[in-house]
């Protein structure tokens, strides 16, 4: 079966130990059909000569893990966007467009094994009190986002606080949300700190080919504070207003009223 084909069958057959921790040494995501049968997974990737000592320190509690996944681990290989064109005809096709990585899985509303940005710690963190410096911003404005992070566990730890932006205007085809910034903080047990993000126009923009520049459409945007791309802790809304006028592109379906609207 799948478990045996991936080298873990003997562990379950022999019932060596119910409390099994799997340490992954890999360069990219792998299928993990055995995930629900183990107590924990430590993803160390390809760390180099100090991997063994660092792994032991984490497993025995001398160090507290704080890393986050820089990629999505899918449920199975066939869930990946590249699967549809593999192995290809001596060339690779990248058909995802702007829906690369977690953006693809979000758009497809697809369940994943572990989401982009995921990573556990031996302590826990509480997110609270999100505050925006304004409810509306323009192209030249800076939006300040404050959020309070509290270490609610019993040991010191580090958390990577992630900020995603979701364009709710519907003006262009865009991902459900996009990572725009992240900040790593260290907290002692019971300690709390305010994390501050500063967002400019680029945080709300996409590249508009007709304009030949980054363009932030008029409309509402969700500011999402998260522990991972699938673990949104806090959300606030802001309105963006732009004075930039896009070039008018006429087609055979353009009506006279659209010409008049653009001229005005």
Task: List where the protein language model places each region.
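Single conserved hydrophobic/aromatic residue that forms the stacking wall/gate
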Residues: 1-12
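Intrinsically disordered, low-complexity Pro/Gly/Ser/Thr-rich segments with frequent PxxP/GP/PP motifs
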Residues: 171-209
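Short acidic, flexible loop segments centered on an aromatic residue
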Residues: 154-171, 177-179
């Amino acid at each position: 079966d799948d478990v045996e084909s991936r080298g873990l069958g003997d562990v379950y057959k022999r019932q060596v130990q119910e409390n099994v921790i799997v340490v992954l040494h890999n360069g990219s995501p792998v299928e993990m059909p055995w995930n629900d049968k183990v107590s924990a997974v430590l993803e160390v990737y390809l760390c180099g000569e100090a991997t063994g000592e660092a792994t032991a320190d984490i497993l025995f509690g001398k160090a507290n893990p704080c890393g986050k996944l820089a990629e999505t681990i899918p449920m199975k290989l066939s869930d990946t966007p590249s699967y549809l064109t593999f192995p290809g005809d001596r060339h690779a096709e990248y058909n995802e467009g702007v829906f690369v990585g977690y953006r693809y899985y979000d758009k497809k509303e697809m369940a994943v094994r572990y989401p982009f940005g995921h990573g556990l710690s031996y302590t826990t963190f509480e997110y609270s009190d999100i505050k925006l410096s304004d409810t509306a911003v323009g192209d030249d404005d800076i939006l300040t986002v404050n959020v309070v992070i509290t270490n609610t566990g019993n040991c010191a730890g580090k958390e990577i606080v992630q900020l995603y932006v979701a364009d709710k205007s519907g003006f262009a085809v865009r991902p459900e949300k996009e990572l725009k910034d992240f900040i790593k903080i260290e907290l002692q047990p019971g300690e709390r700190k305010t994390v501050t993000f500063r967002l400019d126009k680029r945080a709300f923009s996409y590249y508009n080919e007709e304009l030949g520049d980054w363009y932030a459409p008029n409309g509402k945007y969700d500011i999402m504070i998260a522990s991972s791309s699938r673990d949104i802790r806090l959300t606030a809304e802001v309105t963006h207003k732009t004075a930039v006028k896009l070039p008018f592109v006429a087609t055979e379906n353009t009506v006279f009223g659209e010409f008049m609207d653009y001229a005005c």
